[in-house]
Amino acid sequence: MHEIEKTKRKRNKDILKMSKKIAIIGAGMMGSALAYPAFENGNEVRLVGTPLDRDIIDGCIKNNQHLKFDIPFPQGVKYYQFEDWKTAVEGVDFVIGGVSSFGVDWFLTEVLAHIDPSVSVLSVTKGLINLEDGTLISYPD
């Protein structure tokens, strides 16, 4: 066996050892887009829709594809409606919050407040937040 081939095999074994269980909360464009590289890098991916994502998750379950994407998700991505989110986050290594800025408060109260504090959480929020006086500010201002 060539040295290059040995190196590739060792790297692949190392990647498998590093694989993580990831729950992505939010099946919109951002959360769903992250499912591809997360899975392709050897991780178990659980995509959880918010209450606004019911049709998206139904489509994923039926066709393995987001309603607005041209390509299907990798085989093996698991899909959950929001009412099953607690099942989806059981045993995960980390949670990705893939909700819009207008959903951050919802994510904090409905999800983050109930996740085991030992689980790492990453937020990929983009956009603006609307203050009570009508002022728009960007996260994390």
Feature roles, as predicted:
Residues 52, 86, 128:
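Residue-level detector of flexible, active-site-proximal loop/helix-junction positions
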Residues 74-90:
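A structured beta-alpha segment of the ubiquitous adenosine-cofactor-binding alpha/beta core
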Residues 18-71, 78-80, 110, 131:
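NAD(P)+-binding Rossmann beta1-loop-alpha1 motif at the extreme N-terminus of oxidoreductases
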Residues 90, 94-141:
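Rossmann-like NAD(P)(H) cofactor-binding subdomain of soluble oxidoreductases
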Residues 6-17:
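Short, Lys/Arg-enriched N-terminal segments with co-localized hydrophobic residues
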